Design a protein with these regions (language model features):
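Non-globular, low-confidence helical/coil segments that flank catalytic cores
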Residues: 1-238
């Protein structure tokens, strides 16, 4: 009997440790400067995945991809959304179409299309590019979304989307962006709520950063998602 009880206790401890490891692996940083929203940067390896919850009413995903973690949607994105009680994404914002930003997004759209998840996705938001004929990933995401019944929106600098008291201002790309240089033409978002400002920079390089500075678009912010995962070729000192 003692062996059996010890075995049960030990098994419970193992499960608890495993659950803790899974939670740590999924969530890298949780940032909540105000009660009306929460920003979670997920540990997706070499890639990006950010979930923003707003006023307990709206949830959005900003990018979701990785080049070194397989089945990101199944093993990281969906489990995290479930752990937060999120059954609907009001928007998935794709900054650009490199694999390390879209692999998990593609999976989520496929799951919705095949009715393999209860998650609902309302909108897929892409940068407005004039030349997408050679961009297979862009066309694939658009087609998947349409097949899954997800509305596709394209945005450019000057556009703005509101979720209650939170505003998402599109700072980039310019209306003339072709999309041939996916990094430099990536979507840049500024999130504004009361006295808070956050900046999501995709993978823009220093050339685009300099243009945004010259245009007076880059101001002091409380939260910065560095471009190119913190690469020395992006997010300059200014």
């Amino acid at each position: 009997v003692m062996k059996s009880e010890n075995g049960k206790i030990f098994a419970w401890k193992i499960r608890a440790v495993y659950a803790g490891m899974v939670c740590f692996a999924i969530l890298l940083i949780s940032y909540r400067p105000h009660e009306n929203f929460r920003i979670a940067c997920l540990d997706v390896g070499q890639g990006d995945g950010i979930v923003v919850e707003i006023e307990n009413r709206w949830s959005i995903l900003i990018d979701g991809g990785s080049t070194n973690k397989n089945e990101l949607g199944k093993y990281q994105l969906l489990p995290y959304l479930k752990s937060r009680g999120i059954s609907r994404l009001d928007g998935i914002y794709v900054s650009h179409t490199d694999e390390d930003h879209i692999s998990g997004v593609r999976e989520l759209l496929e799951f919705v299309e095949k009715d393999l998840t209860s998650l609902r996705i309302e909108n897929l938001i892409l940068p407005k590019w004039s030349d997408i004929q050679e961009n297979k990933n862009y066309r694939e995401l658009t087609e998947l979304a349409e097949s899954a019944g997800v509305r596709v929106l394209t945005v450019k600098a000057g556009d703005e989307i509101r979720y209650g008291t939170v505003r998402l201002k599109v700072l980039w790309p310019e209306s003339t962006a072709s999309g041939r240089e996916v990094n430099e033409d990536a979507m840049v978002l500024e999130m504004i709520s009361k006295d808070f400002k956050g900046l999501f920079t995709g993978d823009i390089g220093m050339v685009t950063e300099e243009k945004l500075i010259q245009n007076g678009c880059l101001e002091d912010v409380d939260f910065l998602k560095t471009a190119h995962h913190g690469s020395r070729y992006s997010t300059g000192a200014e």
